[in-house]
Design a protein with these regions (language model features):
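Charge-dense, low-complexity intrinsically disordered segments
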Residues: 1, 5-8, 80-90, 124
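Short, contiguous alpha-helical
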Residues: 4-22, 27-76, 116-162
């Protein structure tokens, strides 16, 4: 297995861990906050899907392609909105994942890079390659899968990763 497939496989493993935290839940349970945090399981899935989609756009179009999903919309990424369902959020996440995987497999080179957008959390003048973006997505997804596991355990005692 080559580097590209290893990265896709690792990202997909962590996606699966995140999805597993939502197994057998109702929409109401997926929308419920169970800790002092604002986070809920449905909102985490929604957020991770949005972040992955934005970074996939970065890979192909650079920082300008990442616009959207900022400011007021940012906080809403962590909540299930009226009318959203867990099944719908999971289907949306699956579609984003398929798109990212297809993109990665189609890239001529993982060294394709773009300058990062201007933001307080990015060092000025730094560029990220497609490879670096994938590493970031793996870390982001794994971190949020851990958050989701805590939320799920607080919800009904179920553990998805332990």
């Amino acid at each position: 297995m080559g580097e590209r497939e290893e990265l896709v496989e690792t990202l997909d493993k962590h996606r699966g861990l995140l999805r597993r935290t939502a197994r057998d839940l109702t929409d109401e349970q997926a929308a419920r906050r169970t800790t002092a945090s604002e986070l809920c399981l449905g909102g985490l899935i929604k957020h991770v899907a949005a972040v992955e989609a934005r970074w996939a756009r970065f890979i192909t179009g650079g920082a300008a392609a990442m616009r959207g999903g900022q400011d007021g919309e940012w906080a809403e990424q962590f909540r299930m909105a009226e009318g959203e369902t867990l099944a719908g959020l999971l289907a949306g996440y699956e579609a984003v994942a398929r798109g990212t995987d297809e993109l990665v497999r189609s890239l001529p080179d993982l060294d394709l890079a773009h300058p990062l957008p201007s933001a307080p959390w990015f060092e000025p003048g730094v560029s990220w390659s497609a490879r670096r973006v994938l590493l970031h997505l793996i870390a982001e997804t794994a971190q949020h899968a851990g958050h989701a596991d805590i939320i799920r355990e607080a919800l009904d005692g179920a553990k998805s990763m332990g």
